[in-house]
Amino acid sequence: MTRLLFVLVLSVCLLPVPVKASAVKSLKTFVNKALTFQANFSQTLLDKNFQVIRKASGSMMFERPGKFRWTYDQPYQQLIVGDGKQVWFYDQDLAQVTVHRLDQALGSTPAALLAGGNTIERDFNLQEIDVQGETEWLEAIPKNQENSFELIRLGFSKTGILREMVLRDSFDQVTWLIFSEIEQNPTLTPDLFQFTPPEGVDVIRD
């Protein structure tokens, strides 16, 4: 996708737009009915001028509440696993694992946000925004000022399927996620949400 198209799409996504009435309903349906979820994703990180900093891709899955697995395949291999109590960040290239309590990580990764159950209305101020093409957008602004992201937008299909996420951090960097090969409520085995550090890696705990 060209830089011009990034600018057009993301500038529209991050501007205030008229209020509509169906995105919050889509979110509530997604939270209440999508108890498990898996998809592939493409991720693009852009600076405040919409210059591409980095692209990545991989797969993700979650099981509510608080269990998720987020795997980066390209351009580097990284794994994030939430087991319901802790979140494990494994960087294969660095041979390092960082461990956080789940409640500390809920605002720091898209995976933790999506797997967080029905607390999103408690933790975020929600605003419905306009339909853009086939996507209905919802804006979520964290109530906790220590959240890693200042603004999050969720894009749903008209049938209530999560298709995209746009996240802006305190440095005005934007992370754009597009999901594909989506399955809602697949059967996921418990071992997917368990992690044992490989031998020889450094383990850093909060």
Curated annotation (Swiss-Prot):
One Pfam family of this chain: LolA
Disulfide bonds: none
Compartment list: Periplasm
Domain of life of the source: Bacteria
Main localization of the protein described in the UniProt heading: periplasm
SUPFAM superfamilies found in the cross-reference section: Prokaryotic lipoproteins and lipoprotein localization factors
Keyword DNA-binding part of the UniProt annotation: no
Subunit annotation: Monomer.
Name of the protein in question: Outer-membrane lipoprotein carrier protein
Organism of derivation: Nitrosomonas europaea (strain ATCC 19718 / CIP 103999 / KCTC 2705 / NBRC 14298)
